């Protein structure tokens, strides 16, 4: 389902809620929400998600965690994607990307993926299954899990969009 944000720079919980009514949720195990906009605003708002997974393509540079700390600090998992291109992209260092993430005091796991070459896909699927099982157990116990939302997000958002 594609959600139109109108003139907003990111999704909000109301938009996601309305879109979920278009789905038969009892038939789904996992719903992915891909937010829009830059790497600052989306991390600052609760969409009702249980986890934040941040994708970092090797074509974007290993410095992204340092440049966009709000997004990466909120991550429960960082996926390094398109890793099959590491053979031809000599200025991306996976270890440097992880080091930049750790500089943010993040303990989120880091996985390397290449959908094209099927590298790391089993590990990614296993992680998703573990998270799904953990969420099912939390739900059974009447608990939930809140995502890591940056507390200064609304202030930062207002400053970025001030006239």
Predicted regions and their residues:
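Conserved C-terminal guanine-recognition region of P-loop GTPase G domains, centered on the G4
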Residues: 38-108
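Cofactor-binding loop segments of dinucleotide-utilizing enzymes, especially the Rossmann-like FAD-
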Residues: 5, 57-58, 115
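Nucleotide-state-sensitive switch-loop elements of NTP-binding domains
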Residues: 1-50, 72
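Canonical P-loop GTPase G-domain recognition
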Residues: 85-142
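Conserved beta-strand scaffold positions in the cores of enzyme catalytic domains, especially
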Residues: 2, 52, 110-112
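A short, charged, Gly/Pro-tolerant segment at domain boundaries
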Residues: 139-163
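Amphipathic alpha-helical transducer elements in NTP-driven molecular machines
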Residues: 10-13, 17, 33, 65, ...
């Amino acid at each position: 389902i594609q959600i139109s944000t109108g003139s907003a720079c990111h999704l909000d919980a109301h938009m996601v809620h309305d879109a979920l009514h278009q789905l038969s949720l009892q038939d789904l195990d996992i719903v992915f929400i891909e937010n829009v906009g830059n790497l600052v605003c989306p991390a600052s708002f609760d969409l009702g998600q249980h986890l934040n997974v941040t994708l970092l393509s090797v074509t974007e540079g290993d410095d992204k965690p340092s440049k966009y700390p709000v997004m990466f600090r909120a991550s429960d998992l960082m996926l390094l994607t398109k890793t099959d291109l590491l053979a031809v992209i000599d200025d991306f260092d996976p270890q440097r990307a992880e080091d930049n993430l750790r500089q943010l005091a993040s303990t989120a796991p880091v996985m390397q993926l290449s959908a094209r070459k099927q590298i790391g896909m089993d590990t990614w699927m296993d992680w998703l299954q573990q998270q799904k099982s953990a969420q099912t157990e939390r739900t059974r116990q009447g608990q939930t899990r809140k995502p890591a939302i940056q507390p200064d997000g609304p202030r930062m958002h207002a400053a970025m969009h001030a006239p």
